[in-house]
Amino acid sequence: MATQTSNPQSVYDFTVKDAKGKDVDLSIYKGKVLIIVNVASQCGLTNSNYTDMTELYKKYKDQGLEILAFPCNQFGGQEPGNIEDIQQMVCTRFKAEYPIFDKVDVNGDNAAPLYRFLKSSKGGFFGDGIKWNFSKFLIDKEGHVVDRYSPTTSPASMEKDIKKLLGVA
């Protein structure tokens, strides 16, 4: 389960679990532009989102982009596998080099504290709840939520906003 400081001001105030169950203090990403996304392996949006995210990561990782992927099984049971299976699929099929974290809940009583913060910072069009797999949050270099993108918004269409935050022409 992810933890947080008592009054979080940015995503850097959170600690989450990596795929091996070890704590990761998100402050290690200070100075980076982040995409935080809830992912699923068996969703109709899986191929397009992972493909676009992998391309964006390859293109901008050296300029300071990081993608933090959090598997979630809350939408249609579309992420039923264990974390090892998920990592294997993502790294083999989509050649993902960005971190895949431990499975989380993004809604409800057991929602990860990080996701509670993200949702309270940028509510969606239909309220605060995450509606489906591949909801994306864009985070600036100071750890603040800049924007929220719907599951059907392709990561490639976020490129202009990412470049602006990275300061890349």
Swiss-Prot record:
Gene3D superfamilies the record matches: Glutaredoxin
PANTHER family reported in the protein's UniProt record: GLUTATHIONE PEROXIDASE (PTHR11592), PHOSPHOLIPID HYDROPEROXIDE GLUTATHIONE PEROXIDASE-RELATED (PTHR11592:SF92)
Family: Belongs to the glutathione peroxidase family.
Enzyme class: oxidoreductase
CC terms in the record's Gene Ontology section: cytosol
Keyword Oxidoreductase on entry: yes
Assembly description: Monomer. Has a tendency to form higher mass oligomers. Interacts with FUNDC1; this interaction promotes GPX4 recruitment into mitochondria through TOM/TIM complex where it is degraded by mitophagy.
Reaction catalyzed: a hydroperoxy polyunsaturated fatty acid + 2 glutathione = a hydroxy polyunsaturated fatty acid + glutathione disulfide + H2O
Keywords, ordered alphabetically: Cytoplasm, Oxidoreductase, Peroxidase
Main location: cytoplasm
Name of the featured protein: Probable phospholipid hydroperoxide glutathione peroxidase
The protein's Enzyme Commission number: 1.11.1.12
Gene Ontology BP annotations: response to oxidative stress
Signal sequence extent: none
Function: Protects cells and enzymes from oxidative damage, by catalyzing the reduction of hydrogen peroxide, lipid peroxides and organic hydroperoxide, by glutathione.
Organism: Solanum lycopersicum
UniProt keyword annotation of Oxidoreductase present: yes
Residues the record marks as active site: 43
Location of this chain's protein in the cell: Cytoplasm
PROSITE patterns reported for this sequence: GLUTATHIONE_PEROXID_1, GLUTATHIONE_PEROXID_2, GLUTATHIONE_PEROXID_3
Gene Ontology terms, MF aspect: peroxidase activity; phospholipid-hydroperoxide glutathione peroxidase activity
